[in-house]
Regions:
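Long terminal segments
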Residues: 118, 125-159
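Structural signature for extended repeat/solenoid scaffolds and their inter-repeat hinge/linker regions
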Residues: 1-122, 126-129, 135
């Protein structure tokens, strides 16, 4: 009070039986955090070099320097993981990519698309091109055009 350190005002609180600390107290004091009245959490794990931000509804952000990762999670079981293996998008339900412009997928290695059910591609025109071999295989295979069907090649073998 009045800039006199002999009359300091200290505002704070202590833990007790009613208000227990969020972490078990220990000698090394490596876990620290802030929890608000509405249960918003910010935690620091010094030995593991991890910072976590969490809401009571299940939204969570984890920054992990030791594990070299960043993870976003929500209450709907959706997550985005960035780590040394790459980026993993995991959805509890559907995953939708939308763009007002074009979407381009590029890979320096093989690219796989797998589905447990039907796989459909639709557009005004469809162009598939291979610089070496193009293969189409199925238990039954159907090629159908509402107009004419053109098959061209240096040599064509039918059965």
């Amino acid at each position: 009070v009045n800039s006199d350190p002999r009359f300091a005002v200290i505002i704070g609180s202590l833990y007790g039986k009613k208000n227990k600390p969020p972490f078990t107290p220990e000698t090394k004091n490596k876990d620290k955090g802030i929890i608000t009245k509405n249960k918003l959490k910010l935690t620091f794990e010094d030995d593991k070099k991890i910072i976590t931000i969490e809401t009571p509804g299940g939204q969570k952000v984890t920054l992990d320097d030791k594990g070299k990762s960043l993870k976003l999670e929500d209450q709907n079981k959706n997550s985005v993981l960035l780590d040394k293996k790459g980026i993993t998008l995991d959805s509890g339900k559907d995953l939708i990519l939308k763009s007002k412009g074009k979407i381009t997928m590029k890979s320096g290695a093989a690219t796989e698309i797998k589905s447990g059910a039907d796989l459909k591609a639709q557009g005004v025109n469809l162009a598939l091109k291979a610089s070496a071999k193009a293969g189409l295989e199925g238990a039954t295979t159907e090629i159908k055009g509402s107009g004419k069907v053109v098959v061209k090649g240096g040599m064509i073998n039918l059965n």
